[in-house]
Protein backbone atom coordinates (compact mmCIF):
# COMPACT_ATOMS: atom_id res chain seq x y z
CA UNK A 1 0.00 0.00 0.00
CA UNK A 2 2.95 2.29 0.58
CA UNK A 3 3.86 2.23 -3.12
CA UNK A 4 0.27 2.69 -4.27
CA UNK A 5 -0.53 5.61 -2.00
CA UNK A 6 1.66 7.97 -4.05
CA UNK A 7 -0.43 7.31 -7.14
CA UNK A 8 -3.86 6.17 -6.00
CA UNK A 9 -6.47 7.63 -3.69
CA UNK A 10 -7.95 5.58 -0.86
CA UNK A 11 -11.20 5.23 -2.82
CA UNK A 12 -9.34 3.91 -5.86
CA UNK A 13 -7.55 1.33 -3.70
CA UNK A 14 -10.90 0.11 -2.31
CA UNK A 15 -12.28 -0.14 -5.84
CA UNK A 16 -9.27 -1.94 -7.28
CA UNK A 17 -9.06 -4.25 -4.27
CA UNK A 18 -12.57 -5.56 -4.83
CA UNK A 19 -12.05 -5.79 -8.61
CA UNK A 20 -8.80 -7.71 -8.17
CA UNK A 21 -10.34 -10.27 -5.81
CA UNK A 22 -13.30 -10.73 -8.17
CA UNK A 23 -11.03 -11.43 -11.15
CA UNK A 24 -8.89 -13.85 -9.15
CA UNK A 25 -12.00 -15.66 -7.97
CA UNK A 26 -13.37 -15.82 -11.51
CA UNK A 27 -10.12 -17.39 -12.74
CA UNK A 28 -10.21 -20.06 -10.01
CA UNK A 29 -13.86 -20.86 -10.72
CA UNK A 30 -13.24 -21.35 -14.44
CA UNK A 31 -10.82 -24.20 -13.69
CA UNK A 32 -12.01 -27.81 -14.19
CA UNK A 33 -11.15 -28.57 -10.56
CA UNK A 34 -13.95 -26.20 -9.49
CA UNK A 35 -16.70 -27.90 -11.50
CA UNK A 36 -18.27 -31.30 -10.77
CA UNK A 37 -18.28 -32.00 -14.51
CA UNK A 38 -14.47 -31.46 -14.44
CA UNK A 39 -14.84 -29.16 -17.43
CA UNK A 40 -13.95 -25.50 -17.85
CA UNK A 41 -16.72 -23.14 -16.70
CA UNK A 42 -17.37 -20.22 -19.06
CA UNK A 43 -15.62 -17.04 -17.92
CA UNK A 44 -18.83 -14.96 -17.89
CA UNK A 45 -20.53 -17.46 -15.55
CA UNK A 46 -17.42 -17.71 -13.34
CA UNK A 47 -17.19 -13.89 -13.28
CA UNK A 48 -20.87 -13.64 -12.36
CA UNK A 49 -20.46 -16.14 -9.50
CA UNK A 50 -17.26 -14.50 -8.25
CA UNK A 51 -18.82 -11.03 -8.34
CA UNK A 52 -21.90 -12.30 -6.53
CA UNK A 53 -19.72 -13.88 -3.82
CA UNK A 54 -17.32 -10.95 -3.30
CA UNK A 55 -20.20 -8.47 -3.40
CA UNK A 56 -22.04 -10.75 -0.93
CA UNK A 57 -25.10 -10.89 -3.16
CA UNK A 58 -26.13 -14.50 -3.73
CA UNK A 59 -27.48 -14.33 -7.28
CA UNK A 60 -26.28 -17.45 -9.09
CA UNK A 61 -26.32 -18.98 -12.56
CA UNK A 62 -25.55 -22.48 -11.24
CA UNK A 63 -26.78 -24.19 -8.10
CA UNK A 64 -23.83 -23.94 -5.70
CA UNK A 65 -24.12 -27.50 -4.38
CA UNK A 66 -24.72 -29.36 -7.64
CA UNK A 67 -22.36 -27.50 -9.99
CA UNK A 68 -19.31 -26.69 -7.85
CA UNK A 69 -16.93 -29.21 -6.28
CA UNK A 70 -15.79 -28.85 -2.68
CA UNK A 71 -12.83 -26.86 -4.05
CA UNK A 72 -15.20 -24.53 -5.89
CA UNK A 73 -17.39 -24.18 -2.79
CA UNK A 74 -14.35 -23.31 -0.66
CA UNK A 75 -13.31 -20.66 -3.20
CA UNK A 76 -16.83 -19.21 -3.09
CA UNK A 77 -16.86 -19.22 0.73
CA UNK A 78 -13.47 -17.46 0.87
CA UNK A 79 -14.71 -14.86 -1.62
CA UNK A 80 -17.80 -14.31 0.55
CA UNK A 81 -15.63 -13.90 3.65
CA UNK A 82 -13.29 -11.46 1.92
CA UNK A 83 -16.22 -9.52 0.50
CA UNK A 84 -18.02 -9.39 3.83
CA UNK A 85 -14.98 -8.34 5.86
CA UNK A 86 -13.71 -6.01 3.16
CA UNK A 87 -10.47 -6.21 1.20
CA UNK A 88 -8.97 -3.24 3.05
CA UNK A 89 -9.88 -4.68 6.47
CA UNK A 90 -8.07 -7.91 5.65
CA UNK A 91 -5.04 -6.10 4.21
CA UNK A 92 -4.75 -3.87 7.28
CA UNK A 93 -5.14 -6.88 9.60
CA UNK A 94 -2.34 -8.75 7.84
CA UNK A 95 -0.13 -5.67 8.09
CA UNK A 96 -0.77 -5.42 11.84
CA UNK A 97 -0.08 -9.15 12.34
CA UNK A 98 3.19 -8.88 10.42
CA UNK A 99 4.28 -6.01 12.65
CA UNK A 100 4.26 -3.32 9.97
CA UNK A 101 3.64 0.28 10.94
CA UNK A 102 0.20 1.50 9.87
CA UNK A 103 0.50 4.96 8.37
CA UNK A 104 -2.07 7.73 8.07
CA UNK A 105 -2.91 6.85 4.46
CA UNK A 106 -3.73 3.24 5.40
CA UNK A 107 -5.88 4.44 8.29
CA UNK A 108 -7.69 6.86 5.96
CA UNK A 109 -8.36 4.04 3.49
CA UNK A 110 -9.76 1.86 6.28
CA UNK A 111 -11.92 4.76 7.50
CA UNK A 112 -13.47 5.12 4.05
CA UNK A 113 -13.91 1.35 3.71
CA UNK A 114 -16.02 0.98 6.87
CA UNK A 115 -17.66 4.44 6.84
CA UNK A 116 -16.01 5.48 10.11
CA UNK A 117 -16.24 9.17 11.17
CA UNK A 118 -12.47 9.63 11.63
CA UNK A 119 -9.13 7.78 11.62
CA UNK A 120 -8.74 7.79 15.40
CA UNK A 121 -8.39 4.27 16.87
CA UNK A 122 -8.58 2.64 13.44
CA UNK A 123 -6.08 -0.15 14.18
CA UNK A 124 -7.88 -1.05 17.41
CA UNK A 125 -11.24 -0.98 15.61
CA UNK A 126 -9.89 -3.26 12.87
CA UNK A 127 -8.81 -5.82 15.47
CA UNK A 128 -12.22 -5.58 17.12
CA UNK A 129 -13.95 -6.17 13.76
CA UNK A 130 -11.84 -9.21 12.83
CA UNK A 131 -12.25 -10.87 16.23
CA UNK A 132 -15.96 -10.11 16.28
CA UNK A 133 -16.57 -11.54 12.80
CA UNK A 134 -14.86 -14.86 13.47
CA UNK A 135 -16.39 -15.23 16.94
CA UNK A 136 -19.95 -14.62 15.71
CA UNK A 137 -19.52 -16.91 12.70
CA UNK A 138 -18.10 -19.63 14.97
CA UNK A 139 -21.02 -19.36 17.38
CA UNK A 140 -23.49 -19.46 14.48
CA UNK A 141 -21.85 -22.58 13.05
CA UNK A 142 -21.78 -24.35 16.43
CA UNK A 143 -25.47 -23.62 17.05
CA UNK A 144 -26.56 -24.96 13.64
CA UNK A 145 -24.12 -27.89 13.58
CA UNK A 146 -26.22 -30.38 15.63
CA UNK A 147 -29.22 -29.88 13.32
CA UNK A 148 -27.20 -30.33 10.14
CA UNK A 149 -25.20 -33.27 11.56
CA UNK A 150 -28.41 -35.09 12.49
CA UNK A 151 -29.61 -34.66 8.91
CA UNK A 152 -26.35 -35.12 6.99
CA UNK A 153 -23.85 -36.78 9.33
CA UNK A 154 -20.26 -35.48 9.28
CA UNK A 155 -21.09 -33.42 6.19
CA UNK A 156 -23.25 -31.30 8.49
CA UNK A 157 -20.10 -29.62 9.85
CA UNK A 158 -19.38 -28.11 6.42
CA UNK A 159 -23.06 -27.15 6.02
CA UNK A 160 -22.99 -25.31 9.36
CA UNK A 161 -19.76 -23.43 8.58
CA UNK A 162 -20.83 -22.48 5.05
CA UNK A 163 -24.28 -21.19 6.02
CA UNK A 164 -23.01 -19.35 9.10
CA UNK A 165 -20.46 -17.39 7.06
CA UNK A 166 -22.93 -16.84 4.24
CA UNK A 167 -25.62 -15.56 6.63
CA UNK A 168 -23.35 -13.28 8.65
CA UNK A 169 -21.84 -11.79 5.50
CA UNK A 170 -25.38 -11.29 4.16
CA UNK A 171 -24.47 -13.33 1.08
CA UNK A 172 -27.37 -15.76 0.76
CA UNK A 173 -25.35 -18.54 -0.91
CA UNK A 174 -26.48 -22.02 0.14
CA UNK A 175 -25.38 -25.61 -0.52
CA UNK A 176 -28.77 -27.30 -0.10
CA UNK A 177 -29.12 -28.24 -3.77
CA UNK A 178 -28.03 -31.86 -3.38
CA UNK A 179 -30.36 -32.37 -0.41
CA UNK A 180 -33.59 -30.50 -1.16
CA UNK A 181 -33.36 -29.70 -4.87
CA UNK A 182 -31.59 -27.06 -6.96
CA UNK A 183 -32.21 -23.36 -6.26
CA UNK A 184 -34.39 -24.12 -3.21
CA UNK A 185 -32.34 -22.07 -0.69
CA UNK A 186 -33.31 -23.14 2.86
CA UNK A 187 -37.01 -23.79 2.18
CA UNK A 188 -36.44 -27.30 3.58
CA UNK A 189 -35.89 -25.69 7.01
CA UNK A 190 -38.79 -23.21 6.91
CA UNK A 191 -40.27 -24.67 10.11
CA UNK A 192 -36.97 -25.42 11.90
CA UNK A 193 -36.64 -22.84 14.73
CA UNK A 194 -32.89 -23.25 15.41
CA UNK A 195 -31.88 -22.72 11.78
CA UNK A 196 -34.40 -19.90 11.27
CA UNK A 197 -33.51 -17.95 14.40
CA UNK A 198 -29.75 -18.41 13.99
CA UNK A 199 -29.70 -17.28 10.37
CA UNK A 200 -31.98 -14.32 11.12
CA UNK A 201 -29.74 -13.18 13.98
CA UNK A 202 -26.59 -13.60 11.87
CA UNK A 203 -28.15 -11.52 9.08
CA UNK A 204 -29.17 -8.75 11.50
CA UNK A 205 -25.82 -8.66 13.33
CA UNK A 206 -23.88 -8.61 10.06
CA UNK A 207 -26.12 -5.90 8.63
CA UNK A 208 -26.18 -3.30 11.42
CA UNK A 209 -22.55 -2.22 11.01
CA UNK A 210 -19.26 -2.49 12.86
CA UNK A 211 -19.59 0.91 14.57
CA UNK A 212 -22.93 -0.13 16.06
CA UNK A 213 -21.27 -3.29 17.41
CA UNK A 214 -18.65 -1.12 19.08
CA UNK A 215 -21.29 1.05 20.75
CA UNK A 216 -23.23 -1.98 21.97
CA UNK A 217 -20.11 -3.68 23.37
CA UNK A 218 -18.77 -0.47 24.91
CA UNK A 219 -21.94 1.07 26.36
CA UNK A 220 -24.16 -2.04 26.75
CA UNK A 221 -27.74 -0.86 27.51
CA UNK A 222 -26.74 2.79 28.04
CA UNK A 223 -28.31 3.77 24.74
CA UNK A 224 -28.00 7.51 25.45
CA UNK A 225 -24.24 7.16 25.10
CA UNK A 226 -24.46 5.58 21.63
CA UNK A 227 -23.42 7.52 18.54
CA UNK A 228 -26.29 9.26 16.76
CA UNK A 229 -25.66 6.95 13.79
CA UNK A 230 -26.02 3.85 15.98
CA UNK A 231 -29.33 5.07 17.41
CA UNK A 232 -30.69 5.77 13.92
CA UNK A 233 -29.51 2.38 12.62
CA UNK A 234 -31.17 0.47 15.46
CA UNK A 235 -34.46 2.37 15.19
CA UNK A 236 -34.72 2.04 11.41
CA UNK A 237 -33.61 -1.61 11.46
CA UNK A 238 -36.30 -2.47 14.03
CA UNK A 239 -38.97 -0.66 11.99
CA UNK A 240 -37.91 -2.39 8.77
CA UNK A 241 -38.17 -5.79 10.45
CA UNK A 242 -41.46 -5.34 12.33
CA UNK A 243 -43.60 -3.45 9.78
CA UNK A 244 -42.97 -5.72 6.76
CA UNK A 245 -43.35 -8.78 9.01
CA UNK A 246 -46.83 -7.58 9.99
CA UNK A 247 -47.76 -7.24 6.31
CA UNK A 248 -46.41 -10.71 5.45
CA UNK A 249 -48.17 -12.26 8.46
CA UNK A 250 -51.63 -10.94 7.57
CA UNK A 251 -51.55 -10.77 3.78
CA UNK A 252 -49.09 -13.34 2.38
CA UNK A 253 -48.83 -16.42 4.57
CA UNK A 254 -52.35 -16.85 5.92
CA UNK A 255 -52.48 -20.53 4.94
CA UNK A 256 -49.61 -21.50 7.29
CA UNK A 257 -49.96 -22.61 10.94
CA UNK A 258 -49.50 -19.66 13.32
CA UNK A 259 -46.02 -20.72 14.49
CA UNK A 260 -44.71 -21.25 10.95
CA UNK A 261 -46.43 -18.04 9.90
CA UNK A 262 -44.53 -15.99 12.50
CA UNK A 263 -41.16 -17.49 11.54
CA UNK A 264 -41.80 -17.14 7.81
CA UNK A 265 -43.05 -13.55 8.12
CA UNK A 266 -40.06 -12.48 10.20
CA UNK A 267 -37.63 -14.28 7.93
CA UNK A 268 -39.05 -12.71 4.77
CA UNK A 269 -38.91 -9.24 6.32
CA UNK A 270 -35.26 -9.67 7.37
CA UNK A 271 -33.74 -11.46 4.38
CA UNK A 272 -34.61 -8.91 1.62
CA UNK A 273 -32.35 -6.32 3.21
CA UNK A 274 -29.32 -7.89 1.49
CA UNK A 275 -29.23 -11.49 2.80
CA UNK A 276 -30.81 -13.50 -0.02
CA UNK A 277 -31.95 -16.64 1.80
CA UNK A 278 -35.58 -17.64 1.46
CA UNK A 279 -37.80 -20.15 3.24
CA UNK A 280 -40.75 -19.93 0.83
CA UNK A 281 -41.31 -20.10 -2.91
CA UNK A 282 -40.99 -16.44 -3.91
CA UNK A 283 -43.04 -16.89 -7.08
CA UNK A 284 -46.07 -17.57 -4.85
CA UNK A 285 -45.87 -14.10 -3.26
CA UNK A 286 -48.28 -11.43 -4.57
CA UNK A 287 -47.09 -8.48 -6.66
CA UNK A 288 -47.66 -6.20 -3.66
CA UNK A 289 -45.40 -8.42 -1.57
CA UNK A 290 -42.76 -8.49 -4.31
CA UNK A 291 -42.70 -4.68 -4.58
CA UNK A 292 -42.44 -4.39 -0.81
CA UNK A 293 -39.43 -6.71 -1.00
CA UNK A 294 -37.97 -4.56 -3.80
CA UNK A 295 -38.16 -1.51 -1.51
CA UNK A 296 -36.46 -3.45 1.31
CA UNK A 297 -33.75 -4.70 -1.08
CA UNK A 298 -32.97 -1.18 -2.27
CA UNK A 299 -32.75 0.13 1.32
CA UNK A 300 -30.39 -2.67 2.37
CA UNK A 301 -28.36 -2.71 5.56
CA UNK A 302 -26.38 -0.08 7.44
CA UNK A 303 -23.07 1.75 6.80
CA UNK A 304 -19.86 -0.10 7.61
CA UNK A 305 -21.56 -3.50 7.60
CA UNK A 306 -21.43 -6.64 5.48
CA UNK A 307 -24.66 -5.52 3.80
CA UNK A 308 -25.29 -3.52 0.63
CA UNK A 309 -28.10 -1.25 -0.52
CA UNK A 310 -28.47 2.50 -0.19
CA UNK A 311 -28.40 2.01 3.63
CA UNK A 312 -30.84 2.56 6.47
CA UNK A 313 -29.25 5.87 7.43
CA UNK A 314 -29.71 7.26 3.91
CA UNK A 315 -33.44 6.61 4.07
CA UNK A 316 -33.65 8.05 7.60
CA UNK A 317 -31.89 11.26 6.53
CA UNK A 318 -34.16 11.66 3.48
CA UNK A 319 -37.31 11.18 5.56
CA UNK A 320 -36.08 13.61 8.22
CA UNK A 321 -35.27 16.15 5.49
CA UNK A 322 -38.79 15.82 4.08
CA UNK A 323 -40.35 16.23 7.53
CA UNK A 324 -38.23 19.34 8.15
CA UNK A 325 -39.81 20.88 5.03
CA UNK A 326 -43.31 19.95 6.19
CA UNK A 327 -42.64 21.45 9.62
CA UNK A 328 -40.92 24.57 8.24
CA UNK A 329 -37.63 23.82 10.03
CA UNK A 330 -34.22 25.00 8.83
CA UNK A 331 -32.48 21.65 9.32
CA UNK A 332 -33.29 17.96 9.22
CA UNK A 333 -33.36 16.40 12.69
CA UNK A 334 -32.82 12.84 13.92
CA UNK A 335 -32.83 11.62 17.55
CA UNK A 336 -32.59 15.19 18.85
CA UNK A 337 -29.65 16.11 16.61
CA UNK A 338 -29.48 18.44 13.61
CA UNK A 339 -28.29 16.85 10.37
CA UNK A 340 -25.98 19.06 8.32
CA UNK A 341 -26.91 20.01 4.75
CA UNK A 342 -23.92 18.15 3.27
CA UNK A 343 -25.23 14.87 4.69
CA UNK A 344 -28.68 15.54 3.24
CA UNK A 345 -27.18 16.27 -0.20
CA UNK A 346 -25.08 13.11 -0.03
CA UNK A 347 -28.13 11.03 0.92
CA UNK A 348 -30.07 12.53 -2.00
CA UNK A 349 -27.25 11.70 -4.42
CA UNK A 350 -27.04 8.11 -3.17
CA UNK A 351 -30.81 7.70 -3.49
CA UNK A 352 -30.83 9.01 -7.07
CA UNK A 353 -27.91 6.77 -8.08
CA UNK A 354 -29.47 3.60 -6.69
CA UNK A 355 -32.94 4.27 -8.07
CA UNK A 356 -31.53 5.20 -11.49
CA UNK A 357 -29.37 2.08 -11.75
CA UNK A 358 -32.22 -0.10 -10.49
CA UNK A 359 -34.68 1.24 -13.08
CA UNK A 360 -32.13 1.22 -15.89
CA UNK A 361 -31.06 -2.35 -15.11
CA UNK A 362 -34.57 -3.74 -14.74
CA UNK A 363 -36.01 -2.02 -17.81
CA UNK A 364 -33.01 -2.87 -20.00
CA UNK A 365 -33.08 -6.55 -19.03
CA UNK A 366 -36.82 -6.66 -19.66
CA UNK A 367 -36.36 -5.11 -23.11
CA UNK A 368 -33.48 -7.44 -24.06
CA UNK A 369 -34.88 -10.69 -22.67
CA UNK A 370 -38.57 -9.98 -23.38
CA UNK A 371 -39.44 -10.89 -19.79
CA UNK A 372 -42.13 -9.41 -17.46
CA UNK A 373 -41.02 -6.09 -16.00
CA UNK A 374 -41.78 -7.11 -12.39
CA UNK A 375 -39.40 -10.09 -12.55
CA UNK A 376 -36.67 -7.95 -14.12
CA UNK A 377 -37.07 -5.10 -11.62
CA UNK A 378 -36.96 -7.65 -8.80
CA UNK A 379 -33.72 -9.11 -10.16
CA UNK A 380 -32.21 -5.63 -10.68
CA UNK A 381 -33.08 -4.57 -7.13
CA UNK A 382 -31.59 -7.82 -5.84
CA UNK A 383 -28.34 -7.08 -7.68
CA UNK A 384 -27.92 -3.39 -6.84
CA UNK A 385 -28.95 -4.06 -3.23
CA UNK A 386 -26.54 -7.06 -3.13
CA UNK A 387 -29.36 -9.28 -1.88
CA UNK A 388 -29.51 -12.42 -4.00
CA UNK A 389 -33.23 -13.13 -3.92
CA UNK A 390 -34.52 -14.18 -7.33
CA UNK A 391 -37.70 -15.11 -9.14
CA UNK A 392 -35.69 -17.67 -11.08
CA UNK A 393 -34.73 -15.75 -14.22
CA UNK A 394 -30.99 -15.21 -13.58
CA UNK A 395 -29.78 -18.60 -14.93
CA UNK A 396 -31.71 -18.00 -18.18
CA UNK A 397 -30.28 -14.53 -18.93
CA UNK A 398 -28.00 -13.73 -21.86
CA UNK A 399 -24.48 -12.30 -21.63
CA UNK A 400 -25.50 -8.62 -21.82
CA UNK A 401 -28.08 -9.01 -19.06
CA UNK A 402 -25.58 -10.88 -16.89
CA UNK A 403 -23.06 -8.07 -17.39
CA UNK A 404 -25.69 -5.54 -16.30
CA UNK A 405 -26.25 -7.52 -13.10
CA UNK A 406 -22.48 -7.92 -12.56
CA UNK A 407 -21.98 -4.14 -12.77
CA UNK A 408 -25.01 -3.58 -10.53
CA UNK A 409 -23.66 -5.95 -7.88
CA UNK A 410 -20.25 -4.26 -7.98
CA UNK A 411 -21.85 -0.82 -7.69
CA UNK A 412 -24.01 -2.01 -4.80
CA UNK A 413 -21.09 -3.42 -2.81
CA UNK A 414 -18.43 -0.73 -3.21
CA UNK A 415 -21.02 2.05 -3.10
CA UNK A 416 -21.96 4.77 -5.53
CA UNK A 417 -19.97 7.50 -3.78
CA UNK A 418 -16.83 5.35 -3.69
CA UNK A 419 -17.10 4.92 -7.46
CA UNK A 420 -17.66 8.64 -8.01
CA UNK A 421 -14.82 9.68 -5.69
CA UNK A 422 -12.50 7.07 -7.22
CA UNK A 423 -13.19 8.45 -10.69
CA UNK A 424 -13.37 12.19 -10.01
CA UNK A 425 -11.89 12.74 -6.57
CA UNK A 426 -13.55 13.99 -3.41
CA UNK A 427 -13.96 17.31 -1.63
CA UNK A 428 -12.93 19.54 -4.50
CA UNK A 429 -13.03 23.21 -3.59
CA UNK A 430 -15.45 25.40 -5.53
CA UNK A 431 -13.45 28.30 -6.94
CA UNK A 432 -16.35 30.74 -7.26
CA UNK A 433 -19.99 30.73 -6.22
CA UNK A 434 -22.65 31.32 -8.84
CA UNK A 435 -25.59 33.68 -8.28
CA UNK A 436 -28.55 32.25 -6.36
CA UNK A 437 -31.95 31.89 -8.01
CA UNK A 438 -35.24 30.15 -7.29
CA UNK A 439 -36.99 27.37 -9.22
CA UNK A 440 -40.57 26.29 -8.60
CA UNK A 441 -40.82 22.61 -7.55
CA UNK A 442 -43.72 20.34 -6.67
Where are the regions that the model predicts?
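Membrane-proximal intracellular helices of multi-pass ion channels
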Residues: 1-442
Amino acid sequence: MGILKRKLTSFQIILLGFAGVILLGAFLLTLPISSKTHEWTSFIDALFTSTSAVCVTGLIVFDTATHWTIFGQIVILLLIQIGGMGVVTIALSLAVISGKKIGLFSRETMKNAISAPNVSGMVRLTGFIIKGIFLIELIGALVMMPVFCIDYGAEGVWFAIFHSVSAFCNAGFDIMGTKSGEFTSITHYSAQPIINITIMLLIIIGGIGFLVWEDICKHKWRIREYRTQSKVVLIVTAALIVLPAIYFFFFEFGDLPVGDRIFTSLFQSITPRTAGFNTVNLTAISDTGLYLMIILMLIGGSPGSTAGGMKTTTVAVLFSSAFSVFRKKDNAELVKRRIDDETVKTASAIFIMYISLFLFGGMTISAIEKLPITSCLYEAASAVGTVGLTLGITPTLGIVSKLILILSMFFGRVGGLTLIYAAFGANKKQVAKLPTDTIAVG
